Amino acid sequence: MAITGIFFGSDTGNTENIAKMIQKQLGKDVADVHDIAKSSKEDLEGYDILLLGIPTWYYGEAQCDWDDFFPTLEEIDFNGKLVALFGCGDQEDYAEYFCDALGTIRDIIEPRGATIVGHWPTAGYHFEASKGLADDDHFVGLAIDEDRQPELTAERVEKWVKQVSAELHLDDILNA
């Protein structure tokens, strides 16, 4: 088993593709990818480092598999776990709810002890509001818009994975 668990929910395949891009950059020996629809509480508890991918649907709603998993997520003790979040949204058609699900999942795991890393700048995005903000200038995790800015996805993922790897000291962990 790898040291990092990447868990995603996806209806269209976009968030799944992002999860696989992240795994490819980190390496299969470092990160395992799991569909949250097929995952259990014990699956998440087996990792000290978690990357959680959650898309936002319509008017700020979480993807259905994550929505179904939230009660289980509320049972997990996240103390000692390092968590980075990533998610997809549409900043044009749903500008008032862009990547809201990042905030929804943050609001579940942070009070349960999760240490969240991987805040991402809001510069370059055009939206009106988001519950996924860490502060005025940062999302709580990587925000991806495959509908309006697909040409920026690969670069954003690459930069974010490097940032998260540094914040998590993955090189130190792997070389210990």
From Swiss-Prot:
Q: Which UniProt keywords apply?
A: Electron transport, Flavoprotein, FMN, Transport
- The answer to keyword Electron transport applying to this record is yes
> Which cofactors is this protein said to need?
FMN
Query: Molecular function (GO) terms listed?
Result: electron transfer activity; FMN binding
Q: What Pfam families does the record tag this protein with?
A: Flavodoxin_1
TM region(s), chain numbering:
none
Residue stretches in coiled coil: none
- State if DNA damage is listed as a keyword: no
Q: Which family does it belong to?
A: Belongs to the flavodoxin family.
Q: Please give the function described in this protein's UniProt entry.
A: Low-potential electron donor to a number of redox enzymes (Potential). Involved in the reactivation of inactive cob(II)alamin in methionine synthase.
- By what name is this protein known? Flavodoxin 1
Give the species: Salmonella typhimurium (strain LT2 / SGSC1412 / ATCC 700720)
Question: What gene is behind this protein?
Answer: fldA
